[in-house]
Amino acid sequence: MNAQDCLQILRQIKDVAFATVDENGLPQVRVIDVMLVEQGRLYFCTARGKDFFRQLEANGQAAVTGMNEKYQMVRLTGRAHRLSEQKQWIDRIFAENPSMNAVYPGDSRYILEPFCIDNGQIEFFDLGTEPICRAYFSLADEPVREKGFVITDACIGCGRCSRQCPQQCIAQGAPYCIRQANCLHCGLCAEVCPANAIQRRGE
């Protein structure tokens, strides 16, 4: 599994949730088709008259998520930018997504503007396995942001975190250690630790 594989999952799902922020700072979400995926880039389009277009132009920050039939979720957060050579990109999008011709027949397609996300963070989360599995990737060589929890050297070795963990992903040791690929990020371990030895990663 890598970043391109995750983007390909979003393409296979196709109808995914895109979230942006409006002019009042409020979150807005809608279902948008992933039109193309290649070389670490995700492509989509929207019409110039839509609020979605205005929000992308004003801010560019977007969050994308979808889940397939295997209960595998992919989440992408990054900045979307509008592409030049609009007609060329829209023609290619329509060629690879022919159902779009029924929605925007003829030259009406050119009310659409193509966008690309080629930067940001990707999270893969598989609920279809036991234990669950998660992984993190980034686009454009950005550093991967760590999430979840870590057990520090303040651990007293009582084992309470391991016994309470719903995925049993905490191994005994000095200190105890969380298997990050199987962690739910629920925070139960941090709440039950009597030594306050468990902290959020990256803090």
State each model region's role:
Residues 45-47, 67:
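Short His-Asn-centered micro-motif
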Residues 160-177, 188-203:
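Iron-sulfur cluster-binding cysteine motifs and their immediate structural context
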Residues 112-114, 123-164, 168:
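Ferredoxin-type iron-sulfur electron-transfer modules and their immediate structural context
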